[in-house]
Amino acid sequence: MPFGCVTLGDKKDYNHPTEVSDRYDLGQLIKTEEFCEVFRAKEKSSGKLYTCKRFLKRDGRKVRKAAKNEINILKMVKHHNILQLVDVFETRKEYFIFMELASGREVFDWILDQGYYSEKDTSNVIRQVLEAVAYLHSLCVVHRNLKLENLLYFNRMKNSKIVISDFHLAKVETNSLIKEPCGTPEYLAPEVVARQRYGRPVDCWAIGVIMYILLSGNPPFYDELEEEDYESHDKNLFRKILHGDYEFDSPYWDDISPAAKDLVTRLMEVEQDQRVTAADAISHEWISGNAASDKNIKDGVCAQIEKNFAKAKWKKAVRVTTMMKRLRAPEQTDPGTPSPSKDSDKTPSMATPAPSPANTPAEGAPSLPCPSPDTTG
């Protein structure tokens, strides 16, 4: 039955395995993620294709928690740039989450297949991500694991929309903010690395990282020493993130507009209370105006993508950091120490007042108080 596990964990609401097999055929295994297996599934009555995530309870408490969390969050949200929940089943041994099927490609694959790729293409991607995130933030939902691998084209049509996936780390932000560090190291915001309480601004930082990569083919933060072990690699990486130590390097950024650099800088502001919100970023001229260049940057971006993201350590870097032990923040310098200057590379281009506080709901969205902690499951 649709949304069968109304009360997660209540034995009287367990579905029998045949309730799943009577309704759906589980087909090809698409991939194996940290907490689950992802299948392509077909609804028997209609022939429609969906994505199915299967979580095995025997894999431990973290897996069970991730499944219940993703279900609870997906039941809350409905937006055209977010993969929608279709059906849920809980048996004694498994959780099954059925969602819309995104039959398109990851953004990287799309770029590599294009004959022409410009800032305008990136602006279109970032606009859709910002709109979805502004919606989530209006509900006090923090995704906490935004990264390129979680952005998909919904189908293979030329004008396909972008959809955000993977909500097992998402959390409802309460008035006390969030203290549990998690996410993918290369996309972590400084406040997470510093083990401070944090909230919705971490998603905006991650969007800045995504935008930086899409415009240059390079990650903004990387371990120059190319340490092989994760702990040394992460320590070097985290030190750079804490200080906002990135540059608009030549020649990769030579043809990128000042407006694009300005938005990256606003999204990747080290101080979370000064970081631009998703709702405000949508009004930036690079998103809603005509500031995005239409110059073809494909050759340079693709060359760097193939160089950087084919490395084994970057393939492994999609790992998710969920345990405090893995998140060892390096020592912080004096708060008064300025971050490396990027003034020579940026030109202010948002003709709007200073960014509103980071917890401001999206424009036009209801001004909701943050729900109580028990809404997160």
Swiss-Prot record:
The keyword Membrane applies. Residues 347-362 have a biased composition (Low complexity). The protein kinase domain is predicted to be catalytically inactive. This is CaM kinase-like vesicle-associated protein. One of its GO terms (cellular component) is cytoplasm. Keywords: Calmodulin-binding, Cytoplasmic vesicle, Membrane. The lineage of its organism: Eukaryota, Metazoa, Chordata, Craniata, Vertebrata. GO terms for biological process: signal transduction. CDD domains: STKc_CaMK_like. It is found in: Cytoplasmic vesicle membrane. Does not appear to have detectable kinase activity. It is a peripheral membrane protein. Interacts with calmodulin, in the presence of calcium. Disulfide bonds: none annotated. Residues 368-377 have a biased composition (Pro residues). It comes from the Eukaryota. Residues 324-377 are annotated as: Disordered. Residues 24-287 form the Protein kinase domain. Signal peptide: none annotated. PANTHER family: SERINE/THREONINE-PROTEIN KINASE. Belongs to the protein kinase superfamily. CAMK Ser/Thr protein kinase family.
